[in-house]
């Protein structure tokens, strides 16, 4: 991801130059102006690294269009970059249920979302994800009704989210989990990982093993952004 000062985080690629080539050639020229604006605004936030990588967003938009997604769910919103790109990709009468524990960060990007004319598609829920998902499941009409889910929240709970998401997702629906390679630390011995990254590194390893063994979904783990795992519910 490119910082507000022009610096480049190469992500999982071997060279900054190659990552910049991908961004400059294929990602930034296709990125809508409202997304550029929100990405730049996000980089002024102290926790900007929590934002969705633009190349991840581009791939998600492609998936959304490919499956003709209309009803989607987002777990973890932050400033709303992925939320905005989803709203732009789904039809005018499409709906997104967006869950985040912090409304303040969502409101950072809200003026840009409103300016883009897509706020009417969003139902924002300020809550921890697990109780919000359990509440959704109490309504039988929500079960197997979502076309697409994006998960970018507390990594320790990914397996717990997954069980609930599978109840909400229609057969053939797609769920994308972000940060499943955690800066490449999943391939490192634990004693070589910085203490600040170890908890989520361990959580990612555990989730990766869990999802690899889940016969209910087809999966593909990709070195896009900080690593994403794409699952299709059978």
Swiss-Prot record:
CDD domains: AdoMet_MTases (cd02440). It catalyses: an 8-hydroxyflavone + S-adenosyl-L-methionine = an 8-methoxyflavone + S-adenosyl-L-homocysteine + H(+); 4',7,8-trihydroxyflavone + S-adenosyl-L-methionine = 4',7-dihydroxy-8-methoxyflavone + S-adenosyl-L-homocysteine + H(+); 3',4',7,8-tetrahydroxyflavone + S-adenosyl-L-methionine = 3',4,7-trihydroxy-8-methoxyflavone + S-adenosyl-L-homocysteine + H(+); 3',4',7-trihydroxyflavone + S-adenosyl-L-methionine = 4',7-dihydroxy-3'-methoxyflavone + S-adenosyl-L-homocysteine + H(+). Its EC number is 2.1.1.-. The lineage of its organism: Eukaryota, Viridiplantae, Streptophyta, Embryophyta, Tracheophyta. Its cofactor is a divalent metal cation. Belongs to the class I-like SAM-binding methyltransferase superfamily. Cation-dependent O-methyltransferase family. This is Cation-dependent phenylpropanoid and flavonoid 8-O-methyltransferase 1. Binds 1 divalent metal cation per subunit. A divalent metal cation binds at residues 152, 178-179. Pfam families: Methyltransf_3.
């Amino acid at each position: 991801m490119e910082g507000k000062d022009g610096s480049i985080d190469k992500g999982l690629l071997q060279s900054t130059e190659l990552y910049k080539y991908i961004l400059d050639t294929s990602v930034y020229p296709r990125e809508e102006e409202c997304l550029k604006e929100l990405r730049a605004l996000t980089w002024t936030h102290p926790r900007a690294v929590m934002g969705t990588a633009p190349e991840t967003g581009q791939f998600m938009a492609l998936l959304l269009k490919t499956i003709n997604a209309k009803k989607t769910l987002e777990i973890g919103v932050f400033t709303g970059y992925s939320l905005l790109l989803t709203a732009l990709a789904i039809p005018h009468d499409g709906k997104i249920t967006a869950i985040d524990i912090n409304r303040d960060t969502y409101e950072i990007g809200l003026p840009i979302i409103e300016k883009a004319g897509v706020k009417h598609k969003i139902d924002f829920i300020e809550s921890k994800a697990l109780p919000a998902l359990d509440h959704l499941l109490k309504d039988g009409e929500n079960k197997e009704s979502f076309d697409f889910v994006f998960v970018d929240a507390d990594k320790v709970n990914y397996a717990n989210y997954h069980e609930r998401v599978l109840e909400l997702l229609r057969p053939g629906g797609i769920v994308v989990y972000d940060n499943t390679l955690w800066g490449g630390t999943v391939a490192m011995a634990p004693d070589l990982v910085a203490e600040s990254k170890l908890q989520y590194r361990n959580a990612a390893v555990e989730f990766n093993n869990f999802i690899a063994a889940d016969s209910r979904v087809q999966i593909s783990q990709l070195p896009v952004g900080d690593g994403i795992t794409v699952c299709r519910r059978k």
